């Protein structure tokens, strides 16, 4: 999930138990999906899934400092909609209800990308898994491509972990996306236990993740997540506002569902 404008273009137990499955690059690629009971709400302390919540990010400070030429803005909306994704897990076929999270990116006010991302919370570990995304790339107001779109269960793609719940161990490495030749984002834990300030406020108990991809070796991203909030910084983008209006009945999976076909 490295930003389009940049490309341009597990818990400790999980990480240790899956270490034998790590590839030569040292990043864990296979996870104990068979032990998960997946749900589409809740998330975890560093990656909440709260239907109805929207977060707004901007690099206005970077532009004002003369370090960025273009004003980039990002809206992340945790939709009330879910998507059912069917895939092989542990030798059987399972259907997982995922939460739809929309990301809308603009550059100097012009729409550049809208993606619909699919996440589910593994119970009881509360690790949040990433099941894919549908992507629309825009130019001059028209869709011109769908680069980086992928879906677990298709063409050999498998879920990756986007954020473990416990055991944030500095140096841990794992794949967030496992879609051969399409999307292979990886995460490495860099530091934890610090505070940060952004336009939306000051946040404590934060951690930093470095993201890379074997498909674009020169592209390196850094994200900051803070407890109880989620993503606070994405390179030069900073959390500027949080809008929350979840409904009482959003604590179940009886939302509008979209099948994976």
Protein language model features and the residues they cover:
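Bacterial N-terminal signal peptides that target proteins for export
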Residues: 1-9
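Conserved functional acidic sites
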Residues: 23-253
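Hydrophobic h-region of N-terminal signal peptides that target proteins for export
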Residues: 13-21
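Asparagine/serine/threonine-enriched low-complexity, disordered tracts
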Residues: 252-260
């Amino acid at each position: 999930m490295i930003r389009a404008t940049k490309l341009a273009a597990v818990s400790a137990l999980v990480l240790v138990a899956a270490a034998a499955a790590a590839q030569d690059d040292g990043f864990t690629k296979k996870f104990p999906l068979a032990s998960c009971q997946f749900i589409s709400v809740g998330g975890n302390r560093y990656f909440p899934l709260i239907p109805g919540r929207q977060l707004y990010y901007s690099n206005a400070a970077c532009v004002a400092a003369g370090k960025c030429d273009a004003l980039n803005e990002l809206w992340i909306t945790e939709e009330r909609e879910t998507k059912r994704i069917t895939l092989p897990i542990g030798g059987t076929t399972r259907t997982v209800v995922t939460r739809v999270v929309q990301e809308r990116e603009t550059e100097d006010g012009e729409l550049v990308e809208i993606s619909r991302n699919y996440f589910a919370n593994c119970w009881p570990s509360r690790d949040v898994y990433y099941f894919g995304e549908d992507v629309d790339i825009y130019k001059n107001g028209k869709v011109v491509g769908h680069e980086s779109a992928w879906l677990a269960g298709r063409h050999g793609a498998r879920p990756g972990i986007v954020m473990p719940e416990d055991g944030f161990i500095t140096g841990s490495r794992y794949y967030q996306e496992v879609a051969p030749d399409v999307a292979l984002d990886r995460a490495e834990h860099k530091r934890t236990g610090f505070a940060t300030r952004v336009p939306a406020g000051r946040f404590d108990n934060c951690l930093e993740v470095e993201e890379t991809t074997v498909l674009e070796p020169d592209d390196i991203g850094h994200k900051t997540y803070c407890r109880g909030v989620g993503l606070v910084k994405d390179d030069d983008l900073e959390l500027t506002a949080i809008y929350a209006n979840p409904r009482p009945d959003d604590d179940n999976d009886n939302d509008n569902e979209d099948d994976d076909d």
